[in-house]
């Protein structure tokens, strides 16, 4: 399908207007919709509905606006939700006509069309052309402003007289606040009391009245409903509303004219309540049904996946909060009705894959998206790896849905990104407690870059070591490494997928020890190949290692903590050796923290 045939759908709106149909704010359809592909049409807005110049081209897409759905058949699928939508915006079966609602959406009062950019680095790593839809570049750094503003702009002055209200601690809150300020409407946002200050301050900065209420989201939501009824406020739902869905659908509208439809294979969307994917899928499947629309959820927040399997909405007992923008226990009623008919698949991803996707996006754009904002990229990578596209030149489009990242999450993401890329391996290794074992293990791992090394003396027979290092290809390199370790009479276990090890145990390795003649040193290691090997070889004549902790933090210098069992009368000799090595060092043997927590 060409871009020209796509835009004929817009021209049909003009014909329908001549037939007496009224559209809300048709003036907001951009002139580019008529002229970008050289179509000969005049500007048209709500004051020019009788302009005969609109009917200038014969549409090539028959039935793109008029649905030939049998009312008796479709009536079975009608949602119980009652929406206040003009009759001319309904299909014969009484459900919303999302093509018309999307084409007449009021989103361009508050945003510009967001770019669709080639992800060069991601394309190279996946072997397929990948494009990024930059919803992180809207005024509130997420797509949510589209649906929120479209809903509010559809309301009349009487409905907006007392103001609007929403319950949200995330991107929807900012979208409502920004739109309310633009429209000159009073907005109240209800958030749980434990909402981080950075989030509620951002909403307040946009002019909304922020009410912190309740210990959790359910209590805040109940308070929102109470206030709406008591003060006669208009509730702006985050996803389960036709105007919100249609507003998000304008992303699909933009994508279809930003890329050659003949080369477009699939669009990937993060899924929470379903508003984003419902809007995009419903529009795209009407215009370009050959394009796949694929949802992406996390393994611990997969309400849509389970609902599609059971063919009814399923409520999750608990949801993971890492990708908080999609942490929804129950998808919307209207969104589920639409999604169940219009999407092709749902793929699940984990935390490490999301962290890797955030890094991928950063390498391509130098922007840091939030976890839910990177889910589409993570899902695309998993889907393409499992289902190789028949045409390797077919484009994959990922929606970067948001970039409202909490700064304190960056450390966790940086630590887990390489695991998600399968570029880092975590091992638990048991080695014999004898001279040279530590160095032998190090020599097996090198010249690979070691990212962490933790060891604490426990007994005279064996030692347990926790280590991580970078590999080029985990699948091919790891079996060889494990074999080499086994040949040294050591036992190794791959714990790269062990959540307890990655999140907690790595920081608790060791504990108190009563090992004799131990001294503690803190050293600065240069981050270069051979630095650790140089240290081990230099000290082996004067001491043995009883504690060692190293963690690569991404800088030029790494901080190392080493417990050394110094041979009799060799303390001064050890200090001379440390000076000769040239690394900065501090003797921490009398540090009260060491004496209290690491010594028996």
UniProtKB/Swiss-Prot annotation:
Cell compartment(s), UniProt: Mitochondrion; Cytoplasm
Residue positions where N6-(pyridoxal phosphate)lysine is found in the record: 144
InterPro entries in UniProt: ACT-like_dom_sf (IPR045865), Ser/Thr_Dehydratase (IPR050147), Ser/Thr_deHydtase_PyrdxlP-BS (IPR000634), TD_ACT-like (IPR001721), TD_ACT-like_sf (IPR038110), Thr_deHydtase_biosynth (IPR005787), TrpB-like_PALP (IPR001926), TrpB-like_PALP_sf (IPR036052)
Name the record gives this protein: Threonine dehydratase, mitochondrial
Pathway it works in: Amino-acid biosynthesis; L-isoleucine biosynthesis; 2-oxobutanoate from L-threonine: step 1/1
An annotated Gene Ontology molecular function: threonine deaminase activity
GO cellular component: cytoplasm; mitochondrion
Mechanisms controlling activity: Isoleucine allosterically inhibits while valine allosterically activates this enzyme.
Catalytic reactions of this protein: L-threonine = 2-oxobutanoate + NH4(+)
Cofactors required: pyridoxal 5'-phosphate
Classification via NCBIfam families: ilvA_2Cterm, PRK09224.1
